Every structure is written in structure tokens, then in C-alpha cells.
From Swiss-Prot:
Pfam families: DUF359 (PF04019). Its EC number is 2.7.1.237. Pathway: Cofactor biosynthesis; coenzyme A biosynthesis. Keywords: Coenzyme A biosynthesis, GTP-binding, Kinase, Nucleotide-binding, Transferase. This is GTP-dependent dephospho-CoA kinase. GO terms for biological process: coenzyme A biosynthetic process. Transmembrane segments: none annotated. The lineage of its organism: Archaea, Methanobacteriati, Methanobacteriota, Stenosarchaea group, Halobacteria. Catalyzes the GTP-dependent phosphorylation of the 3'-hydroxyl group of dephosphocoenzyme A to form coenzyme A (CoA). Belongs to the GTP-dependent DPCK family.
């Protein structure tokens, strides 16, 4: 549905938020954002196996987790793979090619965000670009957490400002952006 053009690859290397290696610090910042935005139930969305694992190890099961069994295109180590496989969260399985956002992934993300219980979206392919639609679909006060290769975890506080930045990148992808918004259950200019 949407693909990352070669000309935009560098734009996606810059983190969309602060980077940390401390899951407890990240969770404290997420709680602060929920308080500031008067959104005590705002979700935490984790994009990536290692990020999901670290949040779970810190005692916070992500409301939505997107995993693909890989980190930096290599299979995650056995400890992480086993821990995530043992999680008893509801699971959705989708296919999503590398450097892409499939309708299947976008629809699953929308469905998972509407579920009151934690959901793991298991991706065959890659989930690397999923932070963008997660930022667009999540409510104000949510946190989207993804891995920054070689650096740590990036936390994006979902606000109108971060949604605008994500929207600009999302709309710069190649493909049918209107259909992608529809699959995500959003209108192009609509903040939550």
C-alpha cells in the first residue's frame, strides 16, 4: 500500500523523540505525558521486539506491540524470542514487506488500539515503519516507543505536534495515502 522511497530513507534515520536505554525512565516520561495531556488511560504502543521485551521486563505490558522476530534485520536472541512467545496477549498476524506499510498492518493497528486488552501484532516481514501510523492513530497522551538502531529506545509523546510531523512523513511515502488512512480508520487531516 505505502512504500518508503529511496529519497526519504535519510529522513527516517532521525529519531522522532528522545532516545534512552532506560526503560524505567521512559515509562516515567510516558506517565508524565499522560498526566500533562489528562489522558490517564492513554496507551503505550511498542514497535519492535527488543523494545517490547524491555518494556515488559520493566513491568509494563505495552497496550499494543508490533513484533517481527528480528532486530536490525537479524533474528532476536532466544531469551527475547521466548519471552515474547510466552506472552498470553491476544495476537493478530499480518504480512508487511520491508520498507512498507500494508493495509493489513494498518487495519490490525487500528483494531488493536480499540481493544481494551493488550494486543501483539505479529508481523511477517518488517514492522519498522509502523511507528508513523501508530502516532497518527493513537490518542493524545499516548506514547509510541520504537528502537533506534545502535542507540536505544525512542519515545514519541503523541500530541498534535508529533502527529503533524508523523503525518508529513506518512504522506511523503509512495502509494495510495488516502487508502492507507482509510485502512487505519483515520481521515488525513483529522487529529483524534
Amino acid at each position: 500500500m505505502l512504500t518508503l522511497p529511496e529519497s526519504l530513507r535519510d529522513a527516517f534515520k532521525e529519531p522522532l523523540g528522545p532516545v534512552t536505554i532506560d526503560a524505567d525512565e521512559l515509562l516515567a516520561a510516558a506517565a508524565e505525558t499522560r498526566g500533562e495531556r489528562a489522558a490517564p488511560d492513554a496507551p503505550i504502543i511498542a514497535v519492535g521486539d527488543v523494545v517490547t521485551y524491555h518494556l515488559r521486563e520493566a513491568g509494563r505490558v505495552p497496550d499494543v506491540a508490533l513484533i517481527d522476530g528480528k532486530t536490525e534485520r537479524e533474528t532476536v536472541d532466544a531469551e527475547i524470542g521466548s519471552a515474547l512467545a510466552a506472552a498470553d496477549d491476544r495476537r493478530l498476524s499480518v504480512e508487511n514487506p520491508a520498507a512498507s506499510l500494508s493495509a493489513e498492518l494498518l487495519e490490525a493497528l487500528s483494531e488493536a488500539l480499540s481493544d481494551a486488552d493488550p494486543v501483539i501484532i505479529e508481523v511477517t516481514g518488517e514492522e519498522d515503519l509502523a511507528a508513523l501510523p501508530a502516532i497518527l492513530a493513537a490518542p493524545d497522551g499516548a506514547s509510541v516507543v520504537y528502537g533506534q538502531p545502535g542507540e536505544g529506545m525512542v519515545r514519541v509523546a503523541v500530541t498534535p505536534e508529533s502527529r503533524t510531523e508523523a503525518r508529513e512523513l506518512f504522506e511523503a511515502l509512495d502509494g495510495d495515502v488516502e487508502a492507507a488512512y482509510k485502512a487505519l480508520g483515520r481521515v488525513p487531516d483529522g487529529d483524534r
